[in-house]
Amino acid sequence: LLCEKDIHFKYNGESYHVVIADASIHPQGYAAFINYDGDIRGNTVLADIGNGTMNVAFMQNRKPLAGKIFTEQFGVYQCMKKARNEVMRNCQCEVPDHIIEEVFRKGTADIPERYIQAISEVAKDYVKQVFSKLREYGYNPDLMKLYVIGGGGCLIKNFAEYDADRVVII
């Protein structure tokens, strides 16, 4: 990124000259985290749980620690697929994704309880695995706060057992 600090180029017939003074590369989701107004001090972990991946960054006073940034192919979509299969297996019915998403977001939906139960069991297992993966990377809830962003935050909020003083859903 800083190989060429002095750049000349043309765009729409106009000539431009740009000097790059400095550049930083931060984990996905960092912008949402850094703009969070809450009191963020000391050792923290940022987990950005998106559709396809979970990005994890260990931080010290809001700054990512070099060598402590990880990406797992373990996003909400993996949970969605398992929930869809579980409903099919238990209820012999295909449930549209938007209903599963509603259960993920709200913890419930206007469907029979057996469907909610099947989806919820998968979601509970998924969030247990999320916390397990975080611990594998070095997350210790006694020593660090966890900040969760992305769609997976709804799953944590609705289906995980956690200390709300130590886990913040942004």
Residue positions per predicted region:
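Nucleotide/phosphate-binding catalytic cleft detector across ATP-hydrolyzing
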Residues: L1-L46, L65-Q78, H98-I170
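Active-site-adjacent segment of 2-oxoglutarate/Fe(II) JmjC oxygenases
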Residues: E86-H98
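Active-site-proximal alpha-helical scaffolds that flank and shape metal-associated catalytic sites
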Residues: A47-N51
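Short beta-strand scaffold segments in enzyme catalytic cores
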Residues: M54-F58
